[in-house]
Amino acid sequence: MFAHTALRQRCAKWLFATGLFLLLGACVEKPSTLERVKEDGVLRVITRNSPATYFQDRNGETGFEYELVQHFAEDLGVKLQIETADNLDELYDALGKPSGPVLAAAGLVSSERRKAQVKYSHPYLEVTPQVIYRNGRPRPTNAKGLVGKKIMVLKGSSHADLLAELKKQNPGLEYEESDAVEVVDLLRMVDEGQIDLTLVDSNELAMNQVYFPNVRVAFDVGDTRDQRWAVAAGEDNSLLNEINEFLDKAQKNGTLQRLKDRYYGHVDVLGYVGAYTFAQHLQQRLPKYEKHFKSYAKVEQVDWRLLAAIGYQESMWQPEVTSKTGVRGLMMLTQRTAQAMGVSNRLDPKQSIQGGAKYFMKIKEELDDSIQEPDRTWFALAAYNVGTGHLEDARTLAKREKLNPNKWLDVKKMLPRLSQKQWYRQTKYGYARGGEPVHFVANIRRYYDILTWVTQPQLEGQVAEGNLHVPGVNKDKPADQSPPM
């Protein structure tokens, strides 16, 4: 009997302990999304592969969205892990899956059809949806002009939502949604006449138009809209709150503005004829000198594509050019600079590239240590054009105006003042054509962007072999070579 009683007591204690353990376990709170990210030490992000969002070049990962989300990961003190989606449905569906991405950073616009799936962040970039057509074809000016046209947009996109709304007032409007294309593909299809029209956001057109010289804006559709990040609707708000705090801070401290300037502050400088001409020269002239750019870039430890962009801005890759001021050769060196860099024949493209590379890096190394990348590169380019003395004058003016003398975004505002008497009389080195280095830097940045995009690893070697298809450059000339209005 005593044995049975003892057994019952032990069982009761065991059941009590087990129940207490389960009860306590149930009371332990599940870690929040933000806590899980910090515990894992990794921020898993899904995005799209395009010039306006994210792509990989020979130096690694880059893109507006990539850099912005990298700043966020650094704020959290975690590593960034990127994956790309083939289409928007795949991107949205990936959020919330176990061990999947917790954040979508892909230039998304809030969509009613997605609100059951995701929660959107505060805005960080304002864009305008635009109807795109091919130059030389009839230009639609309103929604009625879309009827009877072959239109394609990204499947599940906010542009598809816009067309659905327009169709209510224009029943004859038909369009195709595709999950097999990206924005670059849609613009190429318009450029080559495969489709009549597409819809894209203004920032993506700005980044891509230079590759497709025939595309034009027909008209803007509706009001401007905001791009946002997204998290899964089923997640708690801890990560979303942190994202919103970060984006608000980035807006106030200038991080967003610097990124906008870096990626969008120079995209409209080429114009139609310039874009078409550059694309032709990319195929016809660059292959002759590419090995020299690569060789001396390696010696000087600089990106060869940046050197090539400087060379194109200076001479359009023509080795025998001479200006009215006496600068000569592919890199347009002065006699004094050529002598200092050990160049005996400025018209020899190999020597010119060697001298230009050496001179550019000399300028860059002599800049004030307080100037950090990427601004350091833009400053060096400006000094390559106008001289370090005038650049320092512009930095001094920036200080007087309570601007940041170490940021290109601020200093480029001061450079044009060097041609105005009321300003240059206050400087050490006096008058300069200060607007020139601003355009010089903007052009080189744009050429560099294009070279970076077309020399991605999967396209390696095709430029040199003459096999690279540069969008907008076919055997036939474009329909109209007049600049866009």
Curated annotation (Swiss-Prot):
Active site positions, chain numbering: E314
An example Gene Ontology CC term for this record: cell outer membrane
Region (LT domain) residue spans: 268-485
Location in the cell: Cell outer membrane
Enzyme class: lyase
Keywords: Cell outer membrane, Cell wall biogenesis/degradation, Lyase, Membrane, Signal
One Pfam family of this chain: SLT
EC number: 4.2.2.n1
Membrane topology: Peripheral membrane protein
Family from the record: In the N-terminal section; belongs to the bacterial solute-binding protein 3 family.
NCBIfam families, per the entry: PRK10859.1
UniProt note: domains: The N-terminal domain does not have lytic activity and probably modulates enzymatic activity. The C-terminal domain is the catalytic active domain.
Protein name: Membrane-bound lytic murein transglycosylase F
